[in-house]
Curated annotation (Swiss-Prot):
Official protein name in the record: Bifunctional protein HldE
Region: Cytidylyltransferase, residue numbers: 343-474
Organism: Pseudomonas savastanoi pv. phaseolicola (strain 1448A / Race 6)
Biological process according to GO: ADP-L-glycero-beta-D-manno-heptose biosynthetic process
Catalyzed reactions per annotation: D-glycero-beta-D-manno-heptose 7-phosphate + ATP = D-glycero-beta-D-manno-heptose 1,7-bisphosphate + ADP + H(+); D-glycero-beta-D-manno-heptose 1-phosphate + ATP + H(+) = ADP-D-glycero-beta-D-manno-heptose + diphosphate
Upper lineage: Bacteria, Pseudomonadati, Pseudomonadota, Gammaproteobacteria, Pseudomonadales
Amino acid sequence: MKLSMPRFDQAPVLVVGDVMLDRYWHGGTSRISPEAPVPVVKVDQIEDRPGGAANVALNIAALGAPASLVGVTGDDEAAESLANSLKAAGVLARFQRIANQPTIVKLRVISRHQQLLRIDFEEAFNTDPLALSAEVYSLLDGIKVLVLSDYGKGALRNHQALIQAARKRGIPVLADPKGKDFTIYRGASLITPNLSEFEAIVGHCEDEAQLVTKGAQLMQELDLGALLVTRGEHGMTLLRPDQQALHLPARAREVFDVTGAGDTVISTLAAAIAAGEELPHAVALANLAAGIVVGKLGTAAISAPELRRAIQREEGSERGVLGLEQLLLAVDDARAHKEKIVFTNGCFDILHAGHVTYLEQARALGDRLIVAVNDDASVSRLKGPGRPINSVDRRMAVLAGLGAVDWVISFPEGTPENLLSHVKPDVLVKGGDYGVDQVVGADIVQAYGGDVRVLGLVENSSTTAIVEKIRGQG
């Protein structure tokens, strides 16, 4: 399955569910309390992060998608902390604030990157479902996906009304379910239980075949569009009616903390589906995202650059020969890491020492070097009959093997203006003894503030001379 980065900026998502605040007390531990055999933590940092449905919305916004959130809080400082964090992240949050009841807070005590204790401050909310529904209905017409983030804390009491309202508008509904009654999610487009939650409904599964069979029965009973079972270190399994099960292995390189991993899965799924991705592609992206987030401490979001880099690793496009879509993805990721992009182009028909020196000098002007190579037809037009000596695939393969070169791409035109307009490199480099104003594409690069450099050629190094010498000896 070929992965690519969706257009998240065109994917508005609404999250409805149980909002909570994840609070962290960080500190050092160097002694045992004289009062009891427990460690003493000297707190030196207090950190608040959105949790539950708020973390789902935060993850969606971190990917670059427009995110809205409807939930229930108390009327207290924890609610203010949540509201401020979400506003800073660009999430449109609408809270139903309940007086004389605390916002749900999960307090974790952390020392040396280890969680020592969790303390929960919570009471199940007894909310007015009609008031919450009114907020949701007012936002439905501007979204592409509705997410029900259910932690069983009382914010969601009218699942069916919300699902039916979204379905009437043709809006997919994704639900992260809780509890032992999944009938409340009847008619959802997709539900995402973890294996424990799934088996609490259908019974223990001896193997994957039994999981698939029981999952198919559950989908039929609940009129579900699809079912995604997340299985920890065993990855995840996607089931759809009348289609073969899709098993995806876990992508985590190192598991550090699984807090909020389910939130990351459903948020990435929602944003990708809202961006128009097919479900298998969206699930593959969610699997990559989950592999990233479990390597972080505590409740965390993944950013668009992090997901881009994971896609690059998956597609093998961190270096080498790329198509335009892959190249733009790689360039976006490099820019997100504040790397300077250098671009040069040429025929590179017979690679020689002069080319190698030139490319090393070009690479030294930035952090990443793109080499654009004329394809065979354009070389023939430029150099005449009998050229190129080497096909474009062979020329690019040799260039990609050089340590100075990050990415190689071919182009069919005689000049690289079209590529330059798409890539917008920070530096355009050419070899020769002419002025900057004579460099093809200089006007394009200079128009957006880029730099144009001309490097001197290495003496007695010429592909044309090499070709003529070989032909003369022949």
